[in-house]
Amino acid sequence: MGKEKFERKKPHVNIGTIGHIDHGKTTLTAAITKVANLKSGGKFISYDEIDKAPEEKERGITIATSHVEYETDKRHYAHVDCPGHADYIKNMITGAAQMDGGILVVAATDGPMPQTREHILLARQVGVPQLVVFLNKCDLVDDEELLELVELEVRELLSSYDFPGDDVPVIRGSALKALESDDPNSAEAKCILDLLDACDSFIPEPVRDIDKPFLMPIEDVFSISGRGTVVTGRVERGVIKVGEEVEIVGIKPTVKTTCTGVEMFRKLLDQGEAGDNIGALLRGTKRDDVERGQVLAAPKSITPHKKFKAEVYVLSKEEGGRHTPFFTGYRPQFYFRTTDITGVISLPEGVEMVMPGDNSQFIVELIAPIAMEAGLRFAIREGGRTVGSGVVTEINE
């Protein structure tokens, strides 16, 4: 059996379930795969298969995640579900599972709970564009007014974190009843189809990497006598065409140059695009003007910064992290894309220290500027080992 060819007829969207423990995230994930696949003839994955999520390593951090996929008439979805609360935090901060949108699961029997709030905040911090809400276990609540009240509470909570609480679709239903039904057109399964419709219409289609402005982290620099300087790396986004102007950004003052050649596997190309490992020949650039850790980027598309706010997960001792807490003034290395840069941490007012296993927000000031924008991921390292993982939430200067 050869590998099935992935047919790219529909837009691809990455999505995931978030919400408080035992509110039904995994049951909903199973119900969606069942109903969607009964409708489109795909493969159903049971609750138990999803629940025994395999552990994956992302930047040295172990995260248990389940991946399922399903289709609607309009889209192909890749869906992540995590068994434990800590897995969600790690997943969202490391970007192990990039989310173009999320399904917030709230049990109508409980209403919003502490983790509901924490997941909404994290979604906001790491830049998940939109959420839709599934109000679960509605079959266990007889009182229509109570459902109205829970829905209102969820909408207000979303608004308080800058999601459009008044406009977010809220679908009511029972994931368990939908999962028990074998007919996708049954009354029990209708809530799942409504939820998928809401995802199709409310979660924006992601901009493909190739359609974004060009950026390539520089991994290596060579000089080729008579031709100039070649920088190599993997194109992160966009397209670079021979003859185009690019900027070298980060560490040193930004300089402009022209790309006079692109090669891949020793063959000359007209262009390099997102995902390609290329060498780019730069006109008039000296070998010493460029170094690993800088980026090659479309002019004016990204700027270098030193000071930023971050949301960070600090590895526990068991994960190979620190054994002791750290305080304001802690100076580890921050690994951005291809290089380590030293930086100093300032904890927010009222936060005395950060313990291994915590997630926290704080300000970082690097000793040299790095090409950055909100949403950029980084690792925190100490003597070459990873002790934390973070995402830039706001740029200060």
Curated annotation (Swiss-Prot):
Quote the gene name from the UniProt entry. Answer: tuf
Q: Assembly and partners?
A: Monomer.
- Residue ranges of region G3? 81-84
Kindly give the SUPFAM superfamilies that the UniProt entry links to this protein: EF-Tu/eEF-1alpha/eIF2-gamma C-terminal domain, P-loop containing nucleoside triphosphate hydrolases, Translation proteins
**Which one of the record's GO molecular function terms can you name?**
GTP binding
> Residues in domain tr-type G?
10-207
Q: Where is this region: G5?
A: 174-176
Positions of the region G2?
A: 60-64
CDD domains on file: EF_Tu, EFTU_II, EFTU_III
Write the lineage as a comma-separated list.
Bacteria, Pseudomonadati, Thermodesulfobacteriota, Desulfovibrionia, Desulfovibrionales
Q: Where is the stretch described as G1?
A: 19-26
Q: Which amino acids does the record list as binding GTP?
A: 19-26, 81-85, 136-139
Which intervals of the chain form a coiled coil? none
Organism expressing this protein natively:
Desulfovibrio desulfuricans (strain ATCC 27774 / DSM 6949 / MB)
Q: Which superkingdom heads the taxonomic lineage of this protein's source?
A: Bacteria
The record's catalysed reaction(s) read:
GTP + H2O = GDP + phosphate + H(+)
Q: What is this protein called?
A: Elongation factor Tu
